[in-house]
Amino acid sequence: MIKKRGGPSDAGRGSEPAMALRELTAQALFFELDGVLVEQARLTAEGRVPWLPGALEALASIDPELFLTFVGTARSDIAFGELRERDFQRFCERFVQDCDEAQVPIRKIYSCPYHPKGRQRFRKESVFRKPAPGIYKMAQQEFDLNLGRSWVVGHTTTDILAGQRAGMGTCLVLTGKAGRDGSYQVDPHRVVQDVRHAVAEILRFEVAERS
């Protein structure tokens, strides 16, 4: 079940300590890769990045002075031997190259290749496997992020629950699995058509908050 609610908030918004924290720490946007930015099941070591329509342009519209941009992705395909780790690394290199050419400053790609039913060394539980918020907590430490003023954009209920557990705003896109995976009951802040609408909606929300 998916419901919509308001926007993210800091405890005590409007108080001097909360406002000081907002100014001293960075806001971030986290995007799942498959089903949000690129087509599902089409990650390969060679060839073009299978961008979803308008996804790269959406990333390019993000003001780097307002948000740091990250990718946080679960890679069960690596865990189950469907994609080699080195091939995923090569894919990420092409992904970052496309972003660089579009002047999109991707700060880091976080990924988790582990699954409790995975193969060999990839078979284990991990705090970085969604819906655990480990990926976001690591980014918070590495980049001094204010997760209470940050957002995650995903296409599964697992993505949304992970964002909620990190205390972030959550935006579900109706591409990829479109929240129909049925893994969890979630209550995203926004439900939108695709990543273009997600970025536009988040930016509108932030402008309204700052006015």
What is the role of each PLM region?
Residues 100-105, 144:
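Short helix-capping segments at alpha-helix termini
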Residues 127-160:
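Conserved Lys-Pro-Asp/Glu-containing loop-to-beta segment of HAD-superfamily phosphomonoesterases
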Residues 148, 152-190:
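Acidic, Mg2+-coordinating phosphoryl-transfer loop and its flanking beta/alpha structural elements
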Residues 189-198:
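Short acidic-hydrophobic, aromatic-tinged amphipathic segments that line or gate anion-handling sites
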Residues 41, 78-82, 117-122, 179-183:
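A short acidic, helix-capping loop that chelates divalent metal ions and anchors anionic groups
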Residues 82-101, 122-135, 164-167:
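Short, electropositive alpha-helical surface patch
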Residues 2-70:
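Active-site neighborhood of HAD-like aspartate-dependent phosphohydrolases
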Residues 59-92, 105-118, 163:
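Substrate-recognition element of Asp-dependent hydrolases with the DxDx(T/V) motif
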